[in-house]
Amino acid sequence: VAPTGIAALNANGVTIHSMFQLPFGAFIPDHSDPQFFESTKFETKSTLKRHFKMNGVKKAVIRNMELLIIDEVSMLRADLLDAMDFMMQTVRKNSFPFGGVQILFIGDLLQLPPVVKDEEWRILRNHYRGKFFFHAQVLVQFPPLYIELSHIYRQTDERFISVLNHLRNNQITNQDIATLNQFVKPDFDLRANKGFICLTTHNAKAD
């Protein structure tokens, strides 16, 4: 599973919301009454249990599950992981974390962060120290084993790898800038050249 549709497609999986029949919105990890704040609805353990609907086939998949892989975990919100944990415990009728299923988290925490609206965070901050998956109450109580993969397979140029790592950690040097500037072509003519890729920061600029 994965937090977003694109990430799920890339992993040949499904989204967390689809797999566990979770409504969109924020999740408060207790049994308090649901709240509405402007345009945001807050689910709780009570509302999820009351409105929970899942077909028999999906329940069987979850009850027979031994290992669940969650990809692109940098985008996984703490409250969504707690909601998933609650649903797995409910379906499997097992009070162990994630209903006793082993969870494998995969991702790069320096990539895209979770998306949490300001109005959501004003409520969620009363329950969480942060927005990332490792701030989820289930992982605060039961910390996972972290394994860092250090070998780079996509690049072979050591200088380029060094530049990328410095950019990744916000430690860019003058030497890195000089290396990148070697490939700058200020006289490049867009009209006279075809087949190039133009990267922008926003969709509006790309359009």
Segment roles from a protein language model:
Residues 1-207:
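Conserved ATP-binding/catalytic motifs of P-loop helicase motor domains
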